[in-house]
Amino acid sequence: MSAIFEILDKDAGGRIGKLRTPHGVVETPTVMPVINPNIQLISPKEMRSFGAEILITNSYIIYRKEELRTVALEKGLHELLGFDGPIMTDSGSFQLSVYGSVEVTNEEILGFQEKIGSDIIVPLDIPTPPDVHFRRAEEELATTAERLEAARKFIQSKQLLAGPVQGSTYPELREKAASHLKDLNFEVYPLGAVVPLMESYRYAELVDVIAASKKGLSPTSPVHLFGAGHPMMFALAVALGCDLFDSAAYALYAKDGRYITSNGTYHLEKLNYLPCSCPVCSRYTAEELRKAKNKEELLGRHNLYATFAEIRLIKQSIKDGKLLELVEQRCRAHPKLLDGLKRLYTHSAWLEQFDPATKGTYFYCGPESASRPEVLRFGKRLERFSIEGSAIIRTSPVKGEKDYDRILTFKAPFGTFPAEMEEVYPFNAEVPKFPDYEALSTSLSNTIKLMDLNPGAEFTFICEKEFQHPLIEEIGKKAKLVYREAWKKE
Amino acid sequence: MSAIFEILDKDAGGRIGKLRTPHGVVETPTVMPVINPNIQLISPKEMRSFGAEILITNSYIIYRKEELRTVALEKGLHELLGFDGPIMTDSGSFQLSVYGSVEVTNEEILGFQEKIGSDIIVPLDIPTPPDVHFRRAEEELATTAERLEAARKFIQSKQLLAGPVQGSTYPELREKAASHLKDLNFEVYPLGAVVPLMESYRYAELVDVIAASKKGLSPTSPVHLFGAGHPMMFALAVALGCDLFDSAAYALYAKDGRYITSNGTYHLEKLNYLPCSCPVCSRYTAEELRKAKNKEELLGRHNLYATFAEIRLIKQSIKDGKLLELVEQRCRAHPKLLDGLKRLYTHSAWLEQFDPATKGTYFYCGPESASRPEVLRFGKRLERFSIEGSAIIRTSPVKGEKDYDRILTFKAPFGTFPAEMEEVYPFNAEVPKFPDYEALSTSLSNTIKLMDLNPGAEFTFICEKEFQHPLIEEIGKKAKLVYREAWKKE
């Protein structure tokens, strides 16, 4: 197993990994451009120039169309598409979800994918949509489980086999399904039937679905967020531990005149300017692009450039330990993404176990930053600071502080820690001049906790007049509370 | 005057304008790439391909160097640089600020700029740095004023004359200087000596300097934030009413191996990936770029692509009425920019007069969004809602609400308004599911104000359990307060 997916770098739940397939190694996180075997807006072999390392296509479409099927069986999938790198194939589950039935069995489509040389084979699972009755979700999950067990027995080649996690919008079902599949040792775990959540901007629920599935899986397994192709939510999904995405969006959106950016979608018809630096947008004006004969192709190219630039930014952010800063910025693009961000941090206790102990300087980006894993971790380890005697707590040096036994620094959103640690991660954090309410909530709570842990010490708290928070009163009960202005006069 | 600068679109303090110069019309906001007359990383004539519409160069350097001076005087500035579009010239003020003196008088350098055919002429003002004594700032400002008055008398051609606003970090001096210059009718107003503020990330003070200067100037005059070339802070500066920037950064940063993005700067040496979609970054890997023979030039090109893409995004955001959403997102790039954002909204009452009455859907991006001009405006006009009889306030429909005389909607960060206006701007706002503390502060205050304005009405407030805020108690004193859960059971 470990030979197939290797994790090289980590930040929050995100990671940079190497996925080994029969046709080569793929660096994750990445997006697989969806190739329609019938119509190609941009040829598969050109995909590498945008940054694609792996493609995905639909084996059911190939299976159903005589001329495609014959070529695929005779010359192989890679020759059919004209791409010699890794190719994943879908099974017809999507068609099943749209039309209610497909004209192929699980074994038939598995065998077909194996024969044509797919690098990642997907069984014919049941994609249960969001919001169905629990009973239906459970029943369909049982069918999916049977088919996946059969698939695991059926596929024994070097080709990778995907084990899709279903369970609708029931986190408990997703987690249960995931832990069951974990024991069957699939090589890749797609999270299925999440497209309707993304289409209706239900990012908070999407976060719960991903987190629940991840909790059931081994953290060392690669996870594919099936159907996710909009770069706007890649950072959020990567932070939760998704490694693979697939984009039909680049082409479908281009067909509709939709222009993808990492902050959302524009309609080309409504653009006065092309707000992007890609080769297409640097060369054409919005007006020229609208009138171009190959408008759809150019738009598809722009969409791919924008998509892969976001992947590179995400990978760089993981390297720099800045993934959550990126997530917090991206999630400002839409209030529903902000809901997703807030939901992400309800899982901070779980995320914390993956988050590196030391990383790039913490940047405070907003109230949600107060709930990041490293802030939580700080609050859980306050007992390591043992304080005795007289202790002064202040945001920055004050007169006469050397008369105290201990000098402590207060810094939101963390709390109170020994002044000598100011330059140490995470206390070297870059924070705004005056903390938000939420940052004060965390840091004042942690300060109260520290005081409670050290009942023998005598605390003096130098308060800033900008600290407007009900917990200040609480601090006043446990410490001598002096406002900075009054202190100066003492 | 109005013929020289025409404002076409507005959003917050930002605008899209047309600046007419002897060598053509420039659409603002825009950046003027700085051309060093001695060394050119990228040739002036190529600048158009990146999106540049106007260049800036230093007339003092040309004046001081025999061979440049001769060509400029004989063939003109435009022939010297090989660019037939608008060119602004600096006067030597920068050299004055660095070396303490220059070997030219105000009249000499003005006359020289006029003769060589500069499109925007800059007098030899005194760039007073931040943090000097008030006395010095005042004295230098007096000298600057004299020189600008002389310049205004001296330059009477069709060439545009710039009147730089100085005053160090004293907002009152900046505003005073600006109102004085307003009466002298310059065509362009640079805000001078702000580079040290930007270099040390003092964005909050920069905001105050810009706002103070703008308050003194006519809102119809074009403003140039002299020395600002990093795209990270363009959106913030544009929202305050800056129209022109100049970038030496694209070349200076390239020389140092620094890679510009709209979210900050990377060192090429430390990049594993190129997190951008521009023609350079789509073609090269980080490793290849580091090893390229023309690394500096390629990096300069990337820096220009990134810079002008941000300008296009800003212009599109103004068109869409989404400039403040962009500002709020960009200001997450660094906590000091977040300080700048918070400071921006301390000027909301002033910004509100420029902000269109109706624009694109309001997106809530964080606590600062609660202080946007449109939220402030709503709070100032509560008297237009006259409420009588029984009134129910709720976030979404509840049972039995039709028994009330008036049905009102509560939506943070705004407050309470008639339910029939839910789909009207700004109440059609996209907001997170649960409001932040700051959003509750604004909306609950406005609700209390509405109740006070309508003492005859009987209010019932259906409260959500997620609303944790001290003002809820206040609401309880003025209205019947019922939690949604309890209401269901009634």
UniProtKB/Swiss-Prot annotation, chains A, B:
GO terms for biological process: tRNA wobble guanine modification. Binds 1 zinc ion per subunit. Pathway: tRNA modification; archaeosine-tRNA biosynthesis. Substrate binds at residues 125, 193. The active site is at residue 90. It holds the Pfam family TGT. Its EC number is 2.4.2.48. Its cofactor is Zn(2+). Zn(2+) binds at residues 276, 278, 281. GO terms for cellular component: cytoplasm. The keyword Cell membrane does not apply. Exchanges the guanine residue with 7-cyano-7-deazaguanine (preQ0) at position 15 in the dihydrouridine loop (D-loop) of archaeal tRNAs. Belongs to the archaeosine tRNA-ribosyltransferase family. This is tRNA-guanine(15) transglycosylase. It comes from Methanosarcina mazei (strain ATCC BAA-159 / DSM 3647 / Goe1 / Go1 / JCM 11833 / OCM 88) (Methanosarcina frisia). The lineage of its organism: Archaea, Methanobacteriati, Methanobacteriota, Stenosarchaea group, Methanomicrobia. The gene is tgtA.
